[in-house]
Structures are given as structure tokens and as C-alpha cells.
């Protein structure tokens, strides 16, 4: 390949590599979340990254004329297949396919990457890891949804957040659906209304942005136009007034629609069960939470942080929701012969990691390896004998792989890798049956080398790691 045709390395917008400390932190976060899911009685499930497009549904898209516009879809022979955009739709397919063998209620958790063909932004990725927990089956909805709320709060505390650093916002879609009925909004506009409301806390929206989406169109700062729901001024005004209400009692007095009253009662029942536990102060009603996915039809939850983060340019940004979900009574019943309700929630791990790294509150005991320097190639067998002793004693260790490089270059590599100690043995050490260690984290200018009998290797090296 000539110079003119050399490739320029880079990533598509909305994707990132993770390595080193960031990846170790992410794995610790995942392990903490998983341990808490298991503690709450959830069992693991794994499904493929691809699903048949008609099975996964088109619950994400804002553009009705192109229902698969927000996902990555491909032609596979006679069928279209789609990279999963969440873990709930694959769960619905799995339950419909295996419901005879599953214990119901089925409490499952799943961790896996999802893909969305959306506009990228601060802590908004087009590929990200979700950690889901769902309860599927005919159960008491208040109990199941309270279990999810308690799980969210408990997990965030286990991850290292403090009680005043997050809020679990809960609502019920039936409340606003009742208002939509009273306003005689046509069926073809209902999902657009829901998605407009869901944008309320998104950057650049607020009440004004939502009102634009409820009416004819919204033009963002870049000039991009999003078609609105084409409501009348009165319809849009009444929805905006609804979004300003904060008190459940006030809502109960003003909204008399039976469906709205049903949603309010379900919220009251949920809050009563939540009050039996330890997390009532972290769980708040917020009637603007409706969730943008079309399959939710009752309880909704969205968890936000009470602090801002800074992007790579040092500018304060809103992180957005780090955990969300809700109740879906018809997602599974789309499949023939199955009518099973469900409720669930999902942590956006990459967004949560972004927040935790901002706080510097997640610590990792990262055990860097001991490095064995190769001073003389004729003693290579001896170096590998030392390596075996270290690894047999569960000490992270490696041998330098290029014996042609001098000691200085080997130590430069070790320092770049942040190795705590180097084994430096040459002809004298092997003749005297001794080992020399160099403390690579020691104070510069001091004597950081120590020579001792070979049989003391493990005891001496443990002083440095």
C-alpha cells in the first residue's frame, strides 16, 4: 500500500474504544450491578445480537414513514434482521418462544450491547451496554414495579452514588393517556404526543421545545426540522399545563378521566409498597415521565442524577437518564398464543460510567504485573522458571518479550505500563542463587534495589504489590 492509499484510523460518530482503567472501571460497575440483580432474585439470560425485524418491532422510530429509521437493519435472505435496539423486545420473543418451560413469574436479568441509529452527543452513544432486569407474568403490578424501583436505588447505592445524588422518577402513562382521550386527540397522533412529552428533559427542549413538537414542527439550533403532532393550540396548551403539575393530589382532583384515575391509583399503590422499604426518599412522582418507546402502557420509571458532568472540552452537560423502563402488557402478546404482561428497567452502563468517572467515586484495585527483565538471553530458561514461580503463587507477572532490547528500554516499557516492581537478574544473581528486585514506584534518587536469596522471592515481592 503506497503513501497515498494509507488508511486514516478513526471511528464512526457515536462509537468509542474502551481500554485500560476505563474498561476496568466498567467491568467493576457491571459486576456490582450483576451482583445486586442476583441478590434480588433475578436469573441471567443471553440472546443473540440480531433479531428478525418483524419480531423486534419498530417501537423506537419518530418517523412513521420509515419505521426502521432509528435502528441498523440488514437483508438476510428472505427476511430482514435488525441489531437489537434494547433488550426488552428480544425478551418478549424469548418468553413467547419458551413460556411453557419458564417459571412464572419469570425474573430475568440480561447484560449486552444494543445499537441505535440516532444522533450522537455527550454521553449519548449509538452502541452501548444495557443491564436489564424484568419481571414477566401475571403478578401484582404494584409489587413488581416497587421491586424494580427498590432494585434501581439499591444498585446505584452499591455502585457508589450517595442518596442525594440521584432520583428515581416514577409515573404512569395512563394518566396522560386519559388526558389525551379527553382532548379527543386522534389515534395516529397519540404516539407523537408521547414522544414529544418524553423530550421534555432532553438538552435544548424544555416546555417550549415540547410545545413546538405538539404543534406543527420544531426547528433546532442547527436548523434541522422535526415534524410535530399537529395538535390545536388548545390541545397543546392543556398538555403543557398538565406537565407543570407536581402534586399527585392536585392531579387527582383535576383529572377525572377514568383511565387517568386508574393510573393515579396504580401510582398510589406503588408508593405504599415502596414505603415499606428503605428508598422512599429517592423515589419521586414525576408526571412528565412517559417513556418514548411505544410498547409502554402503564408504570414508567426514569432515573436522573442530581449533578452535571463536564465534556471533553470542560463544558457542563446534562448526562440524561441513567436507568429507565416501565410496564408493557402487550409486548409479548404480539406473538401468537401468548398473553403475558411484563415490567422492567434498564441501566445505561456507559452513561453511568461517564458519570461515576466524573465523580471519581469508583475505585479499582488494579494489580499491575511484575515485570521480569531479560538481561542475558542464555538465561532465558531461568527467567521462565522465575515466571512460573510467580504465576503459581497467583502473582500477576510477565516476561519481557524482546531480549534484544537493553535494560533501559525494558524499564521504560515497565514504567509506561505502571509495573510496581522489576525482577533484574544477570550472571551474578544466577551464580549466587539470588534475586534482585527494583522498586519501580520508589522515590527517585533513593536506593530502590534489593538483592536476597532466591527462596525468599515470594515473601519479598509481596512487599511491593
Curated annotation (Swiss-Prot):
Q: Which UniProt keywords apply?
A: Aminoacyl-tRNA synthetase, ATP-binding, Cytoplasm, Ligase, Nucleotide-binding, Protein biosynthesis
Q: Name the chemical reaction catalysed here.
A: tRNA(His) + L-histidine + ATP = L-histidyl-tRNA(His) + AMP + diphosphate + H(+)
- Where does the UniProt annotation locate this protein? Cytoplasm
This entry's Enzyme Commission designation comes to 6.1.1.21
The yes or no answer to whether the keyword Lyase is present is: no
Highest taxon of source: Bacteria
* Entry's family note: Belongs to the class-II aminoacyl-tRNA synthetase family.
Give the multimer and partner information.
Homodimer.
Protein name as annotated: Histidine--tRNA ligase
Name its species: Pelagibacter ubique (strain HTCC1062)
